[in-house]
Amino acid sequence: MISLFLGSLQVYGQQITRMPYLQMLGEKSVQIRYRTNQAILSEVQVSSDGKTFNRTKKSSQTNTEHLVLIDSLTASNKYFYRIKLTATQFAGDSTYFFKTAPAIGSQEKFSVWTIGDMYPGPNQKNVYEGFKKFIGNKYTNLFLTQGDNVYGGGSDGDFQANFFQIYQNGPLLKQSALFPTVGNHDYDIYPKSQDYPDMAYFQNFTLPTKGELGGLASSSEAYYSFDYGNTHFICLDSYAWGKDNMRIFDGPSDQLTWLKNDLKATKQKWKVVFFHYPPYTKGTYDSDLVPDLINLRSILPKVFDEYNVDLVLTGHSHVYERSKPLKNHYGLSSEFNKAVHWPQSSSGRYDKSTNSCPYLFSTSNVDKNGVIYVVNGVGGATGAARSDAPHPVMEYSLAGQAGSFYFEIDGNRLDAKFINEEGSVLDQFTVFKDLNLKAPSTQTINYFDKLELAATWTGEYVWSNGDKTKNIKVNPTENTVFKVSDPQNCFQESFDIKVNPPLSIQNVEESINIPFESLTIYDLLGRKTKEFKQNGTINKELISELNPGLHILIYQQNGQEKSMKIRTNSY
């Protein structure tokens, strides 16, 4: 692969002034956007191995704003790409690749990085560098924002200098699918109207308005939804007025109606909602005092509770705050009652500290469920908390430090972390959904039988026999109870294995002329020595082929499995 760029790429007067970023990524397609200083044909070549670029998508007209649709892809596959500039010049190297989304409903593990309020300056750059230090060479599937993507007006120049030129340094924009949220500062110099066509935010991002990636069509790029694996993501605009001249917290707005219908329609295991204004905060804003936040809290959390949303990501307040699972709290902080509004009391940190077991959610029994609210408004901006901080719904609160929020979903497990500018984890929590631990069970096996046992959860394991894998194979010779737990003893399962008495040793004369439908012979170490898959008879001729010593014979007779142990001599 030819590698020909540093920052911006110039070839014969043609210059890539905005490096590629990924939009509308799904199971079978992705849109690659980039910008050049001169109008040229848009052309992207794609490879499945990074060596042979045998697929080309190009435009028929020249452009400076390039949007290339790559389709007919396969879910959960890695693809390399490069941008053609001239007949022999390309922008691209081995770091230019993406991975298509897993099939909807897939339990495949994926990762998400999120930031909010990216005020320009050293903090913003340090937050990104801290995340790169934390993540190392691991791939990040999705990149979400919580609004206020730029400051100083929200112009295209602001986006170019303080968004694209920051996050194009490293793998993120060229590898991870970007799904942003709009914040109040993105609207600064524009009418406060959703989908305003001249607004830089809406010009720079291509977002799913027609349900192309799952979810219901919103007919707006200000709010939308998409599916990724087993998770349904919803982005809202918590600031501007819609085409109905209403904001989402003004009453029965178009956006609120769409939100309810979209949540009602999804069948995904996990539900994640992200937007700018926080319903609960005691940071640089106070959700007890700001009218918009009060109005928003009176409406949105009720919807999230009704439709069992799992995680809500917000910004605006320039602190980091994270609640325990929260339920049925829509009033002032003084009205919060932990006995009523916290269905689970753990910190959720799952780090072996006191009272830190994971949160347990269920799709069938929702009484103990709640919504975890995260305020992540420190992607560049920071500030002091209110004098009465922390907000009582919060499990963890931090002011004066910039950072970002990262989470992974692996089947029925969600792990989340707040990462500071140095790449250190300051807060974390884990949620299991529909864990369904096995009740203690009893099973009877024959003396020679082998058995495979498996723990239910995804994570770490401590078995009573010393094993540390999820699945273990055992061959007990006496009644044994096998127990498994996680290292923190938050989960336990037990398997009571009853073992039939060992077979008595039979002489060869007692073991001849026994018909079988199939037969397998083992030595005493459990190694298979012979196998017969067709009807036959245990007789002198068959036994004469065995080495002298003890043998275990497992055979089918009249549809039943039988076994015996024999001793052979030279026959």
State the predicted function of each range.
Residues 89-97, 503-508, 531, 546-571:
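C-terminal tail/sorting-segment detector
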Residues 78-93, 97, 156-267, 286-294, ...:
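Extended active-site neighborhood of metal-dependent phosphoesterases/phosphodiesterases
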Residues 434-442, 490-518, 523, 569-571:
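Residue-level detector of functionally pivotal "anchor" positions at catalytic/ligand-binding pockets or at interdomain
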Residues 470-483, 542-543:
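Solvent-exposed segments in extracellular or luminal domains encompassing
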Residues 521-529, 551:
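Short, glycine-anchored, charge-dense loop/turn motifs used at functional sites
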Residues 456-462:
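Solvent-exposed loop segments of extracellular immunoglobulin-like
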Residues 13-114, 119, 133-137, 271, ...:
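Acidic, histidine-bearing metal-coordination/catalytic regions of metal-dependent phosphoesterases
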Residues 31-33, 448-456, 512:
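A short beta-strand segment in extracellular, disulfide-stabilized domains
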